[in-house]
Structure formats: C-alpha cells, structure tokens
C-alpha cells in the first residue's frame, strides 16, 4: 500500500520523508465501519463560546502603557490614555528597561531612571516572586522634534506603568476564599492648566504637564504608622468564581496631618480558570482633589504554580487613569492551606526531524547524536490561560480558533512575532476546553536565526476531580497530530479544514474500572498507528499509561525498512465540566538510555529493531452520545 502524508485542505506540516522513504506505512490492523455499530455525535451540552475580548482584556503574561506628556504648543490639546496605547505583551522583562535607557542616552539625561527595574533578579525578595508591577521612567525628558512642523512640544517623564508575570497558575483551589495583599501604581492623562490637590508633591507639574504618578502623592513611608504607599487588597472566592478588592492610598503622618488610608477604587471581577475580568468602580464619581472618578475595565490573572500571587491592569473609561497591580497571599491564607488541584495544562513538545547518518559509527559522532537526542522530542510545561483560547509564543498571546464565522475544523494561520513568522495550526473547532496543534517558523518567510524545530502544544482547562464520573462507559471521538519516523523515512499528520478528513482518535473510557483504551488512526485507510492503554485513580482528573506503535514505515523502501515497534509513556487528562473532553500527548526518542520521553517518565526500552525510532503526538477528543434514530 502506498500513500502520502495528510497535507490537504491548505495545511502543511512541512515534514518530508528522509532519504529512501516516501512517508507511507502499512499496519496489520484494518478497521472497517459496520452499519450495525452505534452511530455517535458530539455531546454539546457543556460547549462554550470563545470569549469575544477587547484588546485590554486579552490574557497575557503582562502588559503596560507609556506615560504621556502635555503638548505645550499649538492648541494644547489634552493627552489621554487609550486602549490603542496599551502594550499587550513584552518579549522579555528587559524590553521596558532597554527602551527607557536608550531614550535616556539619546536625550543625554544623567539621572538614573525612577522605579523598579523590570528585571526579576533585581527585585526585593520580600515582594512578589511570580508577578510584579510598577513604574519605570526618566525625568526631565523633552521632545521638541515636531515643534516646527506640527506645533507639538512635550516635556515631562518618559517610561511605563507595567506588570509582568513569569509563571501562570496551574493548581488552584476549587472552593474556599483566598486573600491577597500588595501594591498598585497608576499613570494619568494630562490637561493644560489642570491641577489636583492630591498631587501635592508635584509642584504644579502632575496632570498639568505630564502624567501624574505615585511620587506626586505625599504617601506614608513609615510602616510604624500603618500600611505604606499604595495598597491593593483582594478576596478570591474560588467556589463562586468571584474576585473582589480595593485600591487605596495612604496619607503621610506629619505634625499637621494625621495618618489616613483612603480607598479610591472597588474591584469586582469574575474568575475564568486562572484569569479574571471585571471592573474598577471609583468611590467618588466627581472630585476636585484627584482624577480617580471613572469606572474602568480590569483584567488580570493568578501567578505561581499554586496561585500564590495575582496581578493585572485596568483602564478608566474616561481614559484619564491607567493602573497596574500585584499582590501575594496573606499570611492567613498561607496558614489555611486551601485544598488545590491541577486545573490548567500547558504542554509543549519540541523536536527536529533531522536524523544522523545511520552508517556513521565513530565515537565522536555517537556522542554528538546522544546529546542531540537528549534535547530532541522533549516535553515541557508552558504558561497557559486555562480557557485554551490563546497560545503563548515568545510571550505573545496568539489567538486560537474559532475566530469569527468560520466552518474550518482546523485552522492554519501565519503570525508575525518579533522578527519571525510562525505558522500555527490548531485543532479542533468542536473542542471547547482543550486545544492542541503545532507551530513552526515558516521556511518561506526568511526568518532570522531559523531553528528548524517543530513545536506541538496542548492547552486545557481540566475537569475538577469532584466532577469526574464514577460509573459508566463513555465513547470519545477526536483527532490527533503526530510524527513518527526512523533514520530512513518518516510519516506525519496534522489536520484538515474538513472534519471527516482528519486522522481519527477513538477512545473508550470505563469510569467504573478507571481505564482508558484508544486508537490513533490514519485518516484515509482508518488503519491503527498507535494503541493507547491508560488508567486513572479515583478522584483524579488525569490518566497515565502506554502508547504502542507496531508499524512499517514505507514498506516498499529500497533500503528494506523494518517494522518500527516501540512503547512509550502517554499522559493526559479530562477537560471541561463533567469530563466532556479529553486530551493527551506522548513522545518517543529511540533506544537511548540517557533520553527522556516525557517530563515525568524514563525511556521505555525498545526492541532491537527500533533504536532510531522517533515520535511526537498530541490528541484531543469529545464525549459522544448515540444518535437517535428518526
């Protein structure tokens, strides 16, 4: 039997067979549908629609906004803050620092920047460990470059208000209340001639000529008098999925002024997996003392492996205030130790299809090959936002489908990120709580520093363990993306825009016995490529087992390719309410005792005929119900 990889419907894996191979394979098992078998359809009772989010509400590891300055020439129009000015991601924490320091050099400013450097290694160890927020700017900045041509002249501060997290939460409480306390910062719009009494440290500059900042308020700085600076406080009820809180400032105690902690905003948000979205509401709708008088849009998330911290941002509706905040669990919450479980998955498999020369046997080459294998076909955890609507590539949140009115079962799109163009393929439209797929640098886009690597991903919001069924046999049907090869030839499958042309994944789950069996098949012949057997413990939302391959890749190869036979560890989980979906992944890295086929398991021994076998697979499936005959 001769066939070709599944590269139809406009999608391309760009994995070609190696020398001597055509990319096809034979298997012993052939599955022929029978008309007497039950007919199934997706159980859509728990399906969700992708959230339609504005730019400010799109989840990311962090974000920020530039301070603004007042035009001192021409009509002296106000400088507002707006959503178009929001920076939704930073490629690294040093992005802000580098920009501010470059402007400092260009303007020949000799004073050091003000605020915390956006570099985790330099932070106070008493502050947050996983997410932090603040200001970073230079004073005495001027820009008169457009004075003659556009009658625009600016003078003030140059820099950013920002927050940045380095690890999104994976384990969260399923019930109970956690409290958090931390800090917040703000920047304001400007209006010529406008002053506010709260900004008493600014000598008439804040809001009049430039963005006001925390330094313009006479804040308490002595902890003996109470809380100091700007205070953020939160209460997260993980049972009701509600986040409430408040943002306050402190008045410094002096001979003529008493210490006072005054609330400026209330926070009300809904928790979505490890993110939250909602609003800030001012305590005053009008004020001559300050501009904190307008309701605003708020978005943020939980950070740290166990949601130990949170961070986020907000923008006032009147475009006069942008704020960032971060906080960590209070000592009371730490002592209470709420019961937590893994609810968020983010997995990334990285591999290259380059193979070594099978005839080379020198010690030097063998050593080099082993080192390459240690890094190839490996799986790692990545930050994920739970709802599986966005994939982080180089810290940029790439939207996954469905986007708009599309009937495509699998999507394939280009995304320009930094100096690279990535091809991102995602599956599947009928999956609401788990998404899988792959991405790679497009060879046709002249990317710089092209790695030649491929990346498979799996993202999902797991089923709480209390919602896993305890009885019943359930059928799950879905699809898979995968690569299998040896040192002579290879085969790959991704997806197709048409659902019935995708490589099928079929699973039977026995919730009584806590077992799962499955088959990953070819799209054209329905022949089985991988058999899966797994188990899961009572009260667990994850399964683990083995994936077995017993295939001949390109049997007509003139180099007499032998049958590839290996077994490796498969990991997966149930996703969505009441285990409505499932997904998983596995890799195989050959008969190499120093390599690891998954992040938590050692290499499974291979038969002598498969020392050069390699595989990488991700899959997902939807719970089925029998069709009603009419």
Curated annotation (Swiss-Prot):
Residues 32-50 have a biased composition (Polar residues). Keywords: Cell outer membrane, Lipoprotein, Membrane, Palmitate, Signal, Virulence. It is found in: Cell outer membrane; Cell surface. A lipid is attached at residue 18 (S-diacylglycerol cysteine). It is a lipid-anchor. It comes from the Bacteria. Residues 1-17 form the signal peptide. Gene3D superfamilies: 2.40.128.240, 2.40.160.90. Residues 26-53, 280-301, 591-613 are annotated as: Disordered. A lipid is attached at residue 18 (N-palmitoyl cysteine). GO terms for cellular component: cell outer membrane; cell surface. It holds the Pfam family TbpB_A. Belongs to the TbpB family. Haemophilus acquires iron by extracting it from serum transferrin (TF) in its human host. Acts as a transferrin receptor and is required for transferrin utilization. This is Transferrin-binding protein B. It comes from Haemophilus influenzae (strain 86-028NP). The gene is tbpB.
């Amino acid at each position: 039997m001769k066939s070709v990889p599944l590269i139809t419907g406009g999608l391309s894996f760009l994995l070609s067979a190696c020398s001597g191979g055509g990319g096809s394979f034979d298997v012993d098992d052939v599955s022929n549908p029978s008309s007497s078998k039950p007919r199934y359809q997706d159980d859509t009772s728990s399906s969700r629609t992708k959230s339609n989010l504005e730019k400010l509400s799109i989840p990311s590891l962090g974000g920020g906004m530039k301070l603004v300055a007042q035009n001192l020439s021409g009509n002296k129009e106000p400088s507002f803050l707006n959503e178009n000015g929001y920076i939704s991601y930073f490629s690294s924490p040093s992005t802000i620092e580098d920009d501010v320091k470059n402007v400092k050099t260009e303007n020949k400013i000799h004073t050091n920047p003000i605020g915390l450097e956006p570099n985790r290694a330099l932070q106070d160890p008493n502050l947050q460990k996983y997410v932090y927020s603040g200001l970073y700017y230079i004073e005495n900045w001027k820009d008169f470059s457009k004075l003659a041509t556009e009658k625009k002249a600016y003078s003030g501060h140059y820099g950013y208000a920002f927050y940045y997290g380095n690890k999104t939460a994976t384990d969260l409480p399923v019930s109970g209340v956690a409290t958090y306390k931390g800090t917040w910062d703000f920047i304001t719009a400007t209006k010529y001639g406008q002053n506010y009494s709260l900004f008493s440290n600014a000598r008439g500059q804040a809001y009049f000529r430039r963005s006001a900042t925390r330094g313009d308020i006479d804040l308490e700085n002595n902890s003996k008098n109470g809380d100091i600076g700007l205070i953020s406080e939160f209460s997260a009820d993980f049972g009701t999925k509600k986040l409430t809180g408040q943002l306050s400032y402190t008045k410094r105690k002096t001979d003529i002024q008493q210490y006072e902690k005054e609330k400026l905003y209330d926070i009300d948000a809904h928790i979505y997996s490890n993110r939250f979205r909602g609003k800030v509401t001012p305590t005053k709708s009008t004020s001559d003392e300050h501009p904190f008088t307008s309701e605003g849009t708020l978005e943020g998330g939980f950070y740290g492996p166990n949601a130990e911290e949170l961070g986020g941002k907000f923008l006032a509706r009147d475009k006069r205030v942008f704020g960032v905040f971060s906080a960590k669990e209070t000592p009371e919450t730490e002592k209470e130790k709420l019961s937590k479980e893994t609810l968020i998955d983010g997995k990334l498999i990285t591999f290259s299809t380059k193979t070594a020369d099978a005839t080379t046997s020198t010690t030097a080459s063998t050593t080099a090959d082993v080192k390459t294998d240690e890094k190839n076909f490996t799986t790692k955890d990545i930050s994920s936002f739970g709802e599986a609507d966005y994939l982080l590539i180089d810290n940029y949140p790439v939207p996954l489908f469905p986007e708009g009115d599309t009937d495509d079962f699998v999507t394939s799109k280009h995304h320009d990120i930094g100096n690279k163009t990535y091809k991102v393929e995602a599956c599947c439209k009928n999956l609401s709580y788990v998404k899988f797929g792959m991405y790679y640098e497009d060879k046709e886009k002249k990317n710089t520093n092209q790695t030649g690597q491929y990346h498979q991903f799996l993202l999902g919001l797991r089923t709480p363990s209390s919602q896993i069924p305890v009885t019943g046999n359930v059928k799950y049907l879905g699809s898979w993306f995968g690569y299998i090869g040896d040192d002579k030839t290879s085969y790959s499958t991704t997806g197709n825009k048409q659902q019935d042309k995708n490589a099928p994944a079929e699973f039977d789950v026995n919730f009584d016995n806590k077992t799962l069996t499955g088959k990953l098949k070819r799209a054209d012949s329905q022949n089985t490529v991988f058999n899966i057997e797994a188990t899961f413990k009572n009260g667990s939302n994850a399964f683990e087992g083995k994936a077995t391959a017993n295939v001949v890749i390109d049997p007509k190869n003139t180099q007499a390719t032998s049958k590839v036979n290996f077994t490796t560890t498969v990991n997966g989980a149930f996703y969505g309410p009441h285990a409505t979906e499932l997904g998983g992944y596995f890799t195989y890295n050959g008969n190499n005792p120093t390599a690891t086929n998954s992040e938590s398991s050692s290499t499974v021994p291979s038969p002598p005929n498969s020392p050069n076998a390699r595989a990488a697979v991700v899959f997902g499936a939807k719970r089925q119900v029998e069709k009603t005959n009419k």
